[in-house]
Amino acid sequence: VEAQYSITMDDSQENKTYLSYNRVVGDTLDEMLYQAFDVLDYALVSSPGAPVKQALIDAGIGDDVYGSYDAGILQPVFSFVAKNANASQADEFESIIENTLKEVVKTGINKEALLAGINSSEFKFREADFGQFPKGLLFGLNCLDSWLFDDMKPFIHLECLGTFAKLRKDVDTDYFEKLIQEYLLDNTHGSSVTVKPKR
């Protein structure tokens, strides 16, 4: 998919393209997936030296690479994004992501990165550490992530301490590698998007 965004006449069009690789991940009522992909975002792209981010930076694709996990919709979307890339790098961007993910599945994810991701998520939850946002507001929004789609499950994303404990145990299994294989590599419900600047 290709799209455009507006820039001013004074802005350069060179290396101002956004590239994204997006996959739909289950549904928001699955509390394990809801937390697991937040952890995978950290382990694959957000942490220092994360494999997908490092591979894209080493290839010179974009001047910033980040992940996004949008779980506030019935079918959550997990994305890898390269900012300020070149449109001609779109195929290489997708290839590097897929090859890096295949290597991660084959050799295993860094267990320390997974544990750090779990610890970070659990700390934020326990301490209600949401930065500048009031905790009541964020708790309410977390309730809406499930409540909008099932009136009987408004609190599943607030009752997550058991989920964190289970994820901690799953670090020593191939659970996370299977998630990558199923939802990021074998999954055809997704898109690759190139957004180019236009004056």
Residue ranges, per PLM feature:
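Active/ligand-binding-proximal structured segments within catalytic/core domains
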Residues: 32-44
